[in-house]
Design a protein with these regions (language model features):
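Acidic (Asp/Glu)-rich catalytic clusters
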Residues: 58-67, 94-100, 150-154, 177-181
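Beta/alpha (TIM)-barrel catalytic core signal, keyed to glycine-rich beta->alpha loops juxtaposed to Asp/Glu
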Residues: 110-291
């Protein structure tokens, strides 16, 4: 059975995530991670046109034997011919990366499907698949309502969404399992909440210190279960049914080795209880920059 892990490449091309480990990786580190991932049986990369110079870096390193999932960014203002823009964007990315066919092309901004260019965007995606530029088409979502809106328009082959031990919104009422039963591939991302959950609780970034009750509960629960933050996050997603791929961001081969090791462990026995729903400002990274003090 093929490895479920997918290497996220955002930090290959730009600063990404939280903390000291959020810096853009060096070319040498990037190369080492890819070589090590290949030895572990990981065969898929997740990238995006908006990830800085990631496409060029991947092309320079050479990833001909990898499956590559990419994402089309939000349609810029002033674009009149969406089909031409999509084709040009994907063609340029494929040329930079050095692939003849993508494993999948996802829409990064689900709202584009219901915008003024929605029909043209969908036609462009289907045309790319028809012309064998990609094997599959899909969408990257943030919350349940994104997908519910899209399902009124078409059924994507892949849905990528955030899921982690504190953000379980898409797990309510076995929603992901329901999606999987529809024949849609489910890919999850942000299993460490972009690195935030791996922080030493004594060194939380200032903009997150206002969630002190959460950090106290998180620290106490980890201690009671004798778990590290990384182990807890990984073993939590091990318990979720209906997941096809798990996108992880790593900053070194040692980091990847640690994560891979915990994926061989059984699911955690007892999940943390927060007492009430966690604030959206904590679990939704789109809101982080809006709430800096």
């Amino acid at each position: 059975m093929e490895n479920k892990l997918v290497i996220g490449t955002a930090n290959f091309g730009m600063n990404y995530g939280q903390g000291m480990d959020s810096k853009r990786l060096s070319e040498q580190t990037t190369k080492e991670i890819l070589q090590f991932a290949r030895r572990l049986g990981i065969k898929t990369l997740d990238t995006a046109i908006s990830y800085g110079d990631c496409s060029k870096r991947l092309g320079f390193i050479g990833i001909e034997d990898w499956k590559v999932i990419t994402k089309i960014p939000k349609i810029p203002n002033g674009i009149n011919d969406v089909n031409d823009w999509v084709k040009h964007s994907i063609s340029q990315s494929a040329q930079e990366i050095g692939v003849s066919m993508f494993e999948a092309i996802l829409i990064h901004n689900p709202g584009d499907f219901v915008g003024e260019h929605g029909k043209e965007l969908l036609w462009s995606l289907k045309d790319l698949k028809k012309k064998r530029v990609t094997k599959k088409i899909g969408v990257s979502i943030y919350e349940k309502k994104d997908l519910e809106t899209i399902l009124n328009i078409f059924q994507p082959e892949i849905v990528q969404c955030p899921v982690n031990i504190v953000d379980k919104r898409l797990l309510k009422n076995e929603y992901l399992h329901e999606i999987s039963n529809m024949g849609i591939e489910v890919h999850i991302r942000s299993i460490f909440l972009q690195g935030l959950l791996t922080y030493d609780t004594e060194n939380i970034p200032v903009e997150f210190t206002r969630f002190k009750d959460f950090w106290q509960n998180w620290k106490s629960w980890l201690s009671s279960q004798k778990l590290t933050p990384v182990e807890a996050c990984v073993r939590f997603v091990n318990s979720i049914q209906g997941i096809d791929k798990i996108v992880i961001g790593v900053n070194s081969t040692l980091h990847l080795q640690e994560i891979f090791h915990y994926f061989s462990k059984p699911p955690i026995k007892e999940e943390p209880r927060w007492g009430s729903d966690l604030e959206t400002e904590l679990i939704d990274p789109r809101l982080w920059n809006q709430n800096k003090t």
